[in-house]
Amino acid sequence: STIRDLDRQITTLFNRLPCKPLGFPVGRAPSLATIISEIGDIQRYPTLKKFLSHLGWCPQSFQTGNYRLEHPKMSHAGNKYVRRLIWMLSIFAVQRIPRYREYFQRRVSEGKAKMHILVAVGRKLLSALYAILKKGIPYDPNWEENSRLALARR
């Protein structure tokens, strides 16, 4: 069918990319190609914060005078289809990847809202993707633990 043909073409083009997220835990070539097409050149984002802001995956602060919004809402910046895709990848990660499932269950037991936890999982996935694309290295499943150890040694 036409959708399968398009998926094959996207996968073919995705495989030609010089720097692709090898071994990324969630998403196949079409979904990762969608995110990468929205990102463009990763060098445009000097920091993770700017990267997340471009994708609309950050809280939006609202303040006027002495009033400050108690619970900030998600920013609606960026492409809504990409945000929705990141949301779906977060749900998939919680359902299928033990490390993210454990994180989700631990945060639920601490009393956090499930939606907030999914946003945090999405941020973890996007920060891993940012590091992969920025440094040009394959995905390391233990990157969080390794970075904690590296920071502890300083």
Regions found by a protein language model. Name each.
Residues S1-R154:
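A detector of single, family-specific signature residues
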